């Protein structure tokens, strides 16, 4: 583990048996509340793209809004919120995506991304990859070029990274936690 990964993982609270027995919930609110760790995480998410023309950062509800907004600011890019169905006020495009126990839908405004725009997808964590896969499909449906998908936390045992890589998406993460 790198020094940066060690610093960031120390700022993330682990809550056993939440939301159900056998699951360890990785809570980034402690990282967000620590100014040094929050800045370090944003700087590390931004660093690979410094000097690269990125048009939009797409953040997934809800923690992806916090991280994605900060990354968009640093890269002088626009921000696109990807939300659960029914939460956006203007005309939207929608896609169904798989959850661990079923299917849900996410959407974004129809005019949020233009064909050919370079987009980075940002969220706090990738687990099974179902939500991120849905966001990738939604962005591609609108003609976006997905430069990368970036996450603070990867739970590699759950296969989300591979799911996105199989779609041809570059995946970048800052910290890995084994198990669930």
UniProtKB/Swiss-Prot annotation:
Primary localization class, coarse: cytoplasm
Keyword Cytoplasm found: yes
Disulfide bonds: none
Protein name: Adenine phosphoribosyltransferase
Species whose genome carries this gene: Agrobacterium fabrum (strain C58 / ATCC 33970)
GO CC annotation terms, alphabetical: cytoplasm
Compartment list: Cytoplasm
Pathway field: Purine metabolism; AMP biosynthesis via salvage pathway; AMP from adenine: step 1/1
NCBIfam families: apt, PRK02304.1-3, PRK02304.1-5
InterPro entries referenced in this protein's UniProt entry, alphabetically: Ade_phspho_trans (IPR005764), PRibTrfase_dom (IPR000836), PRTase-like (IPR029057), UPRTase/APRTase (IPR050054)
Catalytic activity: AMP + diphosphate = 5-phospho-alpha-D-ribose 1-diphosphate + adenine
Keywords: Cytoplasm, Glycosyltransferase, Purine salvage, Transferase
Signal peptide limits: none
Quaternary organization: Homodimer.
EC number: 2.4.2.7
Keyword Cytoplasm: yes
Superkingdom in the source lineage: Bacteria
GO molecular-function term, one example from the UniProt record: adenine phosphoribosyltransferase activity
Function in brief: Catalyzes a salvage reaction resulting in the formation of AMP, that is energically less costly than de novo synthesis.
Family in the record: Belongs to the purine/pyrimidine phosphoribosyltransferase family.
BP-aspect Gene Ontology terms: adenine salvage; AMP salvage; purine ribonucleoside salvage
């Amino acid at each position: 583990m790198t020094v940066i990964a060690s610093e960031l993982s120390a700022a993330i609270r682990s809550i056993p048996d939440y939301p159900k027995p056998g699951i360890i919930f990785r809570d980034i609110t402690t990282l967000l509340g620590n100014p040094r760790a929050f800045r370090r995480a944003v700087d590390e998410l931004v660093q690979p793209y410094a000097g690269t023309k990125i048009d939009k950062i797409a953040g997934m509800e809800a923690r992806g809004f916090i991280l994605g907004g900060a990354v968009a600011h640093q890269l002088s890019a626009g921000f696109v919120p990807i939300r659960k169905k029914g939460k956006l006020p203007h005309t939207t495009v929608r896609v169904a995506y798989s959850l661990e126990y079923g299917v849900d839908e996410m959407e974004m405004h129809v005019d949020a991304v233009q064909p050919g725009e370079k987009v980075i997808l940002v969220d706090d964590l990738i687990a099974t990859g179902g939500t991120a896969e849905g966001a990738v499909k939604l962005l591609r449906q609108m003609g976006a070029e997905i430069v990368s998908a970036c996450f603070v936390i990867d739970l590699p045992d759950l296969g989300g990274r591979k799911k996105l890589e199989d779609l041809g998406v570059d995946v970048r993460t800052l910290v890995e936690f084994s198990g669930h």
